[in-house]
Amino acid sequence: MIRRNNAVVCGFLFRLVSSFIPIILMVSNAYASDAKKGEALAQGLCAACHASDGNSVIPSNPILAGQHYSYLKNQLNYFQVKEGEDRAKRENAVMLGIASGLSSDDIDNLSAYYSQQKIKPSYASNIELAKAGELVYRAGDDVRGIPSCSSCHGPRGLGIPGQFPRISGQHATYTASTLTSYKNGSRANNSQMMAISSRLTEGQINALAEYLAGLE
């Protein structure tokens, strides 16, 4: 018979259950927001670049459909210059102009709307490059000190609500641009991604971007 330390078992179960509480709350918040109002905003403000349902057909503009509510909400807030600050946490001239006019409710509603849309994923066009990206995504690169991407974003790139964004099915052009921005410091709102991206070679960035575009 295997003997168990009840205190250890209870502690593990408590941590396990506790880890789901933020996710449940965020899902509840997404549905408590007014997605219909978000849809109206999306059609008026966002459709030209991201499409009305968030499935952008412009490779340099991200697909927003199916992205986590919490991630979308955070990014829209990062594009705003908050009181007491002289710049936005995430600098982008176009998004600064749009996000600056959004209220807190607008951000909630837009985030809820896009998170509830079904993604029409992009695709990999270079299979050999995608295979090279898969190796980095799943195993990382010990020599360069790069952890596996799947350890945070999951084996299918779906992320974890409230912690890590969905990255599968995203346009390769946008993903490569994002990783490059983290690498050169022009996007500085995530210290963890800046540290990891700084170790990626240009070839690894392009390979990862290609792999993620076709990951389902």
Outline where the language-model segments fall:
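Axial heme c-ligation environment in periplasmic c-type cytochrome domains
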Residues: V57-L64, F79-S125, P161-R166, N184-E216
